[in-house]
């Protein structure tokens, strides 16, 4: 599974500005989804890869980004 890293309290994607390989996104994806996860910056949001099937990613149901 893959998807955008989401802030559970705001419903917003984690923003990033350095597209492609991005240490911030990689670190945040691993912190939220485990050390097997990967991450990079895609379309100014942190995109996480190698997630478990039940991983919660953006968009959150009934939670829009405020």
From Swiss-Prot:
Residues 1-66 form the LCN-type CS-alpha/beta domain. Belongs to the long (4 C-C) scorpion toxin superfamily. Sodium channel inhibitor family. Beta subfamily. This is Beta-toxin Cbo1. One of its GO terms (molecular function) is toxin activity. It comes from Centruroides bonito. The keyword Secreted applies. Disulfide bonds join 12-65, 16-41, 25-46, 29-48. It comes from the Eukaryota. Keywords: Amidation, Disulfide bond, Ion channel impairing toxin, Neurotoxin, Secreted, Toxin, Voltage-gated sodium channel impairing toxin.
């Amino acid at each position: 599974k893959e998807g955008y890293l989401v802030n559970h309290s705001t419903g917003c994607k984690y923003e990033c500005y350095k597209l492609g390989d991005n240490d911030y996104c990689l670190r945040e994806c691993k912190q939220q989804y485990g050390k097997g996860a990967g991450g990079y910056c895609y379309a100014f949001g942190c995109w996480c890869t190698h997630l478990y099937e039940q991983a919660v990613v953006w968009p959150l149901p009934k939670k829009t980004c405020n």
